[in-house]
A protein has these predicted regions:
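Glycan-processing catalytic domains of CAZymes
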Residues: 1-304
Length: 304
């Protein structure tokens, strides 16, 4: 769930390819977040990886005060997508911030656990990653000394053409439980089934060779041209075929975890959250529900 310190009541200032069904909002609104959790539950989405920047914006406050309590009322779990793993200065302050939030939150029944440990996803930009194997080891030691064992998911993919796997030094790094990456569009402009299958299979080989779990992204669409007019591009919806193709390719590669990128990253246009600009606002959530063998029944809209 994205959080930022914008002016959510002034929709004209938002630079989005299409509009949320409920209008502009931010993730400190309990009614909106509760609705998000009910939408996810209705579709069969198991968990949210929540964009977390600590005190750098409202995401830290939103996670602890709003999102975690909202998830508690549903079967949906939540975990930290630690963006500070990419955007930080020294490791010491990052250890303190991450250990602090885990100390306060990991015991909550709504916090996502895997193999009995709290999950933390460490976001990295493919072409300029901040963490090194050595600094990750320092981060892991520092955090686990304070909170106990953590299930670490590392965002890691080579971006130089012809590889697109996991760098050898990272495959050899201890303490990483799973490898994945945020989006194919960050490294290659592909979206067709015939392109995705070998791409995911190549990445999966590296992850399996390292003996780690495999996390693969799935996109319903993309349109980041509003926020990146020079470099942005679009992946069309294709009447649902785009998301179906990603889903099929991820399953064929043997993914342990399917990353639905994204629930509500509106500026990039990768969302499954209902939009007022779609003939069926719930089109993507209905797709996910079918995968889970259920009929999607929309929960009531939040009071605004």
């Amino acid at each position: 769930l994205w959080a930022d310190r914008g002016e959510p009541a002034t929709g004209a200032k938002l630079r989005l390819p299409f509009r949320p069904l409920v209008g502009p909002y931010d993730s400190t609104d309990p009614a909106i977040v509760a609705w998000h959790c009910r939408l996810a539950e209705a579709a069969g989405i198991d968990a949210f990886l929540v964009s977390w920047w600590g005190g750098a914006n409202i995401s830290g406050e939103a996670f602890e005060r709003v999102i975690l309590p909202a998830a508690r009322a549903t079967r949906v779990k939540v975990a930290l997508n630690c963006e500070l793993a990419q955007f930080h200065g020294e490791i010491g302050p990052l250890v303190e911030r991450l250990a602090g939030v885990l100390t306060r939150c990991q015991g909550d029944p709504a916090y996502l656990r895997r193999a009995g440990r709290p999950v933390v996803y460490l976001y990295q930009v493919p072409f300029d990653p901040k963490l090194t194997p050595a600094t990750f080891a320092e981060l892991r030691r520092g955090v686990e000394a304070k909170v106990g064992p953590v299930w670490w998911a590392m965002d890691k993919i080579r971006h130089d053409a012809g590889t697109y796997g996991v760098p050898a030094e990272w495959r050899a790094t201890e303490g990483i439980d799973g490898f994945g990456f945020y989006g194919t569009f960050s490294v290659r402009r592909i979206s067709e089934r015939a392109e995705l299958r070998p791409f995911f299979a190549r990445y999966a080989r590296d992850v399996r060779t390292a003996g780690r779990e495999l996390l693969l992204p799935m996109h319903p669409a993309l349109d980041n041209r509003v926020i990146q007019p020079k470099e942005g591009f679009a992946i069309p919806f294709r009447d649902g075929e785009t998301l179906e193709g990603y889903h099929a390719a991820a399953l064929a590669a043997g993914a342990d975890v399917l990353l639905l990128t994204s629930f509500n990253e509106w500026p990039e246009g990768t969302v499954v959250e209902p939009s007022a600009d779609w003939p069926d606002p719930y089109r993507h959530l209905r797709q996910v529900a079918r995968w889970k063998g259920r009929e999607f029944v929309p929960p009531p809209l939040p009071a605004r």
